[in-house]
Amino acid sequence: STPIKSSAASDVYKRQIFGYKHVLPTRPGWYACACCPPNLVRLVTSLGTYAWSESETTLYSHLFLGQTADFEKAVVKVDSSYPWEGKVTYQVKAKMKDAFELAIHIPSHIRMDTLCVTVNGEKTDAASCIKDGYLYLKQNWGENDVIELTFDLPVRKIYANTNVREDEGCVALMRGPVVYCFEGVDNGECIQALRIPREIKAETELCKEGVLAGNVLIHLPGYRMESSDALYSEERPKRTDVTLTAIPYYAWANRGENQMRVWMPEE
């Protein structure tokens, strides 16, 4: 995705996974040929077609997108706190008496043992209703049927294929569908000296102030490797305990020029 400035006044064209002075560390205001900004507008106006589709027997919900959608079969209102919270509610107001299916896409990162589905307050065996990544619910829908999905959104460590040489020995963090990165403004200079532990105990925080307000941040114990002043030395770098902070990748470069990295060495 293209990282967008919080004021929408500029954006970053490069989909880089680390940011240093020589690789466009800030957001330019404009380009001679600017294709991404109008494409973003086109995306917003097309969201409805990405979120839903309909067949003769089934309504398909492809995204946990808060909205009200009007179809031949029903009007469906979706209340969603995703991706920051694991709760999505569908309110179905049927236009027809015949039964039809509502198929809800369940992202692959959601663990089935944490997924709870209720229909009008009654718990449903979600595992038996899922096929090819969709939760299928079929019944004679009324004028105010409510489907509620709840699930956990743990912080996950992601590893690259070993054929990706640049990412060997590194991990990235994700929570739900959101990729995270580490910026120098939170973690100090020399980002490459930071290390992620093999076993992490991450905590999340909803940011309430500044340009990142509304975003969920990740805090976790980590390490900083400190070496001697020599360019090369036989002295092994010393490890210092630190608290690391990660922000959503799309939000980087909103707080001035500083280093950024997605893939972090694992210690």
Placement of each model-derived feature along the sequence:
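Single conserved hydrophobic/aromatic residue that forms the stacking wall/gate
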Residues: 1-13
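Short, cationic motifs built from Arg/Lys/His that form the positively charged side of catalytic pockets
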Residues: 6-7, 105, 139
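C-terminal beta-rich recognition modules with glycine/proline-rich loops and embedded aromatic residues
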Residues: 10, 14-94, 119, 123, ...
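Beta-strand-rich binding/interaction modules
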Residues: 97-119
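A broad structural signal for short, well-ordered beta-strand segments within beta-sheet-rich domains
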Residues: 112-114, 126, 202
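Conserved nucleotide-binding/hydrolysis modules and their immediate coupling elements
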Residues: 133-135
